Structures are given as structure tokens and as C-alpha cells.
């Protein structure tokens, strides 16, 4: 049976839409891509299929397809080269899903606020402070949750393949690390050194950001330029 043809309404600048690309790349599902220009009013044809009071099509698609992926295993491909491992118990599955959800929530609620604070920073001093806060949150909230990666794969739970934790956090890890390059000036250049305080997280973040399924649509300079323009400090009167 052939896979259903789907249409992904998306924008490569959006980190939330980016997550759908990661999931679809990993499962090897072919799709037609329609880029939505977020800088202009929506076209009539777009509003016909997606009234403004409803979720965006790429959000609907993202959750429909991501939620069909088994949480307890790395994201499977449609035709895996080897037989899948035998199923584990319902209790183990439930615990894994809970751990993954807790991990992702810790990253988004405790770490990302400092990333956005860095984007809004008016000067290097504020960016350095945001980076220190970001790493402090990582050390306290996220680093301990990666203890089971010691001596194993770099991804969540010690997996050697992407899991839903990387699907959800990947676009933000990619932006955080790349924005720390001096040419972008959006995140403190001290970030790489600061992350040495959290070696498990650093390994996880770098492995995720360099994975082809995570970065294949990422235009670093374009995204950085757009973010700089969007979060530029307001001129003081």
C-alpha cells in the first residue's frame, strides 16, 4: 500500500513548523511543500482551508504525524533495515513517555526563556548575562535528566537515533548554538565555553544540531538576520 500524499503548509523560518520537517524526514514520508509567506496577509485560498480561528495546517499536520510515532522508541522509518525490537511493557512505555514529556517541558520552560532574553538584549553585557542564566538553568534542570546517555548514544534515553525529544527541541538547539557565532551577535560568544559546565547537554545539543534531519532546511544567515530584525531593541527617545 502506498503512503498517503500529504501537503505541508510551512515556513522555514518558523522553529515550530521546523519540527514537522524533522519528523517527516526521519520517517521518510514524501510530501508536497507549500511555503507560507509570514510577512504578508494570508491569501484567500489559504484562509479557505485554514480560517484564522483554527490551528495552522502545519501545526495540525505536525501533531497528527508526530503523535503517531511510538514514544518509547527512536523514530522509525517506514522500511526499517532491521526488525523492530520486541515491545516493552505498558508500564515501561508510560514511564518513558512521562520522562520524555518532563524533559521537553524542562527545556522549554526553564532554558528557552534565557534564549529569547538574549535575542532581545541591547548589548553584549546583557547577552553574556542571558547566556549565563541559560547555562545555569541547563545545569540545574536538564543536565541531570541526561544521565542515562553516559556511555550510550547522544540522544534522549541514550538512543543513537533521534527521538521525539529531539524533534521538538531540535530547531531551538540549532538556533541557540548557531546564533552564538560572532558574525550573528544574537547569543553570547561565551556560550560554547559556558556549556562545558554541562557536558551531557553539550554533547546532546551538538549531536542534535548537526543531524541531517534537523538542519537540512536551515538557512542560518537568513534565519539569524530575520531574528535580529524581529528582536532588535526599540530605539530610545
Which residues make up each language-model segment?
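Acidic, serine/threonine- and proline-rich low-complexity regulatory tracts
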Residues: 200, 207-213
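GST superfamily/GST-like fold recognition
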Residues: 157-186, 194-202
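Eukaryotic N-terminal targeting leaders
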Residues: 1-7, 230-237
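Surface-exposed helix-capping loop/turn segments at secondary-structure junctions
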Residues: 82, 144-158, 181-183, 211-218
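Charge-biased low-complexity scaffold regions
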Residues: 139, 144-150, 169, 175-176, ...
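GST-like domain detector, emphasizing the conserved glutathione-binding G-site
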Residues: 1-154
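Acidic carboxylate-rich catalytic motifs and surrounding loops in phosphoryl-/glycosyl-chemistry enzymes
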Residues: 36, 215-225
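Short alpha-helical "patches" and their helix-cap loops
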Residues: 89-91, 119, 129-132, 182-203
Amino acid at each position: 500500500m502506498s503512503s498517503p500524499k500529504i501537503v505541508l503548509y510551512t515556513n522555514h523560518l518558523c522553529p515550530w513548523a521546523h519540527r514537522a520537517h524533522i519528523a517527516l524526514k526521519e520517517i521518510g514520508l514524501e510530501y508536497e511543500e507549500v511555503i507560507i509567506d509570514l510577512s504578508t496577509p494570508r491569501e484567500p485560498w489559504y484562509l479557505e482551508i485554514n480560517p484564522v480561528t483554527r490551528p495552522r495546517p502545519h501545526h495540525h499536520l505536525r501533531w497528527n504525524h508526530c503523535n503517531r510515532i511510538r514514544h518509547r522508541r527512536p523514530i522509525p522509518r517506514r522500511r526499517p533495515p532491521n526488525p523492530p525490537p520486541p515491545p516493552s511493557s505498558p508500564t515501561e512505555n508510560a514511564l518513558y513517555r512521562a520522562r520524555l514529556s518532563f524533559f521537553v517541558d524542562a527545556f522549554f520552560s526553564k532554558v528557552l526563556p534565557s534564549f529569547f532574553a538574549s535575542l532581545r538584549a541591547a548589548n553584549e553585557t546583557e547577552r553574556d548575562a542571558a547566556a549565563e542564566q541559560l547555562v545555569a538553568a541547563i545545569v540545574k534542570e536538564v543536565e541531570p535528566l541526561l544521565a542515562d546517555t553516559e556511555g550510550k548514544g547522544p540522544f534522549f534515553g541514550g538512543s543513537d537515533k533521534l527521538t521525539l525529544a529531539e524533534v521538538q527541541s531540535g530547531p531551538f538547539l540549532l538556533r541557540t548554538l548557531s546564533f552564538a557565532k560572532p558574525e550573528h551577535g544574537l547569543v553570547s560568544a561565551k556560550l560554547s565555553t559556558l556549556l562545558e559546565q554541562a557536558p551531557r547537554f553539550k554533547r546532546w545539543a551538538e549531536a542534535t544540531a548537526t543531524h541531517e534531519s534537523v538542519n537540512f532546511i536551515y538557512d542560518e544567515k537568513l534565519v539569524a538576520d530575520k531574528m535580529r530584525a524581529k528582536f532588535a531593541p526599540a530605539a530610545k527617545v
